[in-house]
């Protein structure tokens, strides 16, 4: 029988020389070596900005992990150990993080506890080449655990679209409820009272995107002063966006685009070229808002 060994050889360099090499950007965070893509789980907690991101220990794309770095000022970063590794449910694709406590996530936190909850796309694994949503948590912002050993919380079969492109969850809190936007293919919106049990609110089979985000912004007047009006932004991977309202339609929470952003299909949510342009950089992708702790509460309704 033949035995194959895989050995990874790194250049012998001190940390300083990595970051002083030719063409290395100095302002934005960059991984020391290996493959990195989408930012994940961006959250501010206990005086630190936490940044997770897609990572593989190779120059080429491979089985995704969640690597990790922290900062106190968004300029100076400290690399931390990799936190989430592939498991029986699959490799670790993109996701997000929120702050919760016993009242808002009683299955995860005991009375008096709070911490971070992560939502991760598990890709592949024992279930085949499909995508599903799993969770993890931290009660101190320093040690991390997969929830229920990585158990699947939401599956691609749970909504009427039955589309296996089911990834990139982004969670936010609004009206005393948790909401999740999921895409990768078509957009879906789910809701939950406890971050564990999720229900379908609305689906948009004609609108395809990756790395969705949905957040409110206060409208400003012609003098650049804030008004009482709030609009919601559906961010399509940091490249394009739609502006509209997030509200109940026939008892289901839905994103309803303003007329200038709407398409001609029934729910106004198609892929026609009527989106706003968020940036023109061809390599700028998978943008995500930083979760600042009390986003979605009466104390801090608007995104920062």
What are these regions (language model features)?
Residues 1-212, 216-280, 293-304:
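Beta-rich carbohydrate-recognition and catalytic domains
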């Amino acid at each position: 029988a033949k035995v194959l060994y895989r050995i990874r050889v790194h250049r012998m360099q001190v940390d300083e020389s990595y970051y002083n090499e030719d063409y290395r950007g100095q302002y934005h965070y960059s991984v020391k070596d290996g493959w990195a893509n989408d930012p994940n789980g961006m959250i501010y907690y206990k005086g630190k900005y936490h940044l997770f991101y897609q990572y593989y220990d190779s120059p080429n794309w491979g089985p995704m992990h969640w690597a990790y770095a922290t900062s106190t000022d968004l300029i100076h970063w400290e690399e931390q150990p990799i936190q989430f590794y592939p498991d029986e449910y699959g490799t670790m694709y993109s996701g997000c993080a929120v702050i919760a406590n016993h009242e808002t996530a009683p299955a995860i936190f005991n009375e008096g506890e709070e911490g971070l909850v992560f939502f991760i796309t598990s890709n592949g694994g024992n279930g085949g080449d499909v995508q599903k949503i799993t969770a993890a948590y931290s009660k101190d912002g320093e040690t991390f655990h997969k929830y229920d050993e990585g158990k699947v919380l939401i599956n691609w079969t749970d909504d009427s679209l039955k589309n296996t492109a089911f990834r990139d969850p982004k969670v936010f809190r609004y009206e005393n409820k948790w909401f999740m936007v999921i895409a990768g293919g078509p957009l879906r919106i789910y809701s939950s009272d406890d971050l564990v049990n999720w229900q379908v609110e609305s689906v948009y089979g004609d609108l395809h995107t990756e790395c969705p985000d949905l957040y409110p912004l206060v409208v400003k007047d012609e003098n650049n002063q804030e008004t009482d009006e709030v609009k919601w932004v559906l961010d399509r991977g940091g490249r394009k966006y739609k502006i509209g309202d997030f509200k109940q339609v026939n008892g289901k929470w839905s994103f309803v685009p303003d007329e200038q952003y709407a398409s001609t299909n029934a729910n106004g949510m198609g892929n026609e070229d009527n989106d706003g342009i968020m940036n023109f950089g061809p390599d700028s992708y998978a943008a995500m808002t930083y979760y600042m702790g009390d986003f979605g509460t009466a104390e801090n309704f608007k995104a920062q």
